[in-house]
Amino acid sequence: YLAEALLAEGREVHGLVRQASLVQRSRLDALPTCAEAKAAGRLKLHYADLTDSSSLQWLVRQVQPGEIYHLAGQSHVKVSFDLPEYTAQTTGLGTLRLLEAIRQNVPGTRFFLAATSEIFGEPSESPQSETTPVAPVNPYAAAKLYALNLVRVYRRAYGLFAAAGILFNHESPRRGENYVTRKIARGAARIARGLERELHLGTLTPRRDWGWAPDYVQGMRAVLGAERPEDYVLATGRTHAVADF
């Protein structure tokens, strides 16, 4: 959705991909806007990795971007317990490497970090805001909080236009099938087609703030379009239980 929005404005978009990112590349190729832009040379994909600072330094020097949207990293809570070091390397230290590449090569670039509501842990107040105390309870949230603090440090220490969106859940048909919203939608479709008889889920009581992914893209663009870099909570302000879904 972000690439589509930028391309629709006539922007030139550069994306970072890994050698193993075949699924993501195929999804981009399937989108008419992206496929046409790629053919016209306005969408360019580059091999790089958040664990490799030299590749990030080279890419930033070559592209000289006006804006950077940092959405990459290991972002699944359960996986972060299975792969805590990898989560820290990509989600936490990957942000450090990217900020350093910006500071050293393109300090005028506007930088957006996709942070997460997971940093609030089990908050005592609802709804949460930019001033709600943070207390992460999983490795993914801890890595994102480190990344968020780095954004604030680099903004203050080096004067970078570095800002973050503290994002609550945002859903779409493009969401990975290992997330509960897609599990429910996919399960319902398969039952309707007679391919399955039952849908098995865990506890139905957790409440989440679920929003529409394209709306969050508008929020990201607004954060970088602001006069000054600040961090903002992006959410709908309404929660629903899994059972409601």
Where are these regions (language model features)?
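His-Asp-centered acyl/peptidyl-transfer active-site segments
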Residues: 228-230
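N-terminal Rossmann-like NAD(P)+-binding domain of SDR-like oxidoreductases, especially those catalyzing
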Residues: 1-170, 224, 243
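NAD(P)-dependent short-chain dehydrogenase/reductase
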Residues: 124-127, 149-225, 237-242
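Conserved metal-phosphate-binding beta-hairpin within the catalytic cores
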Residues: 234
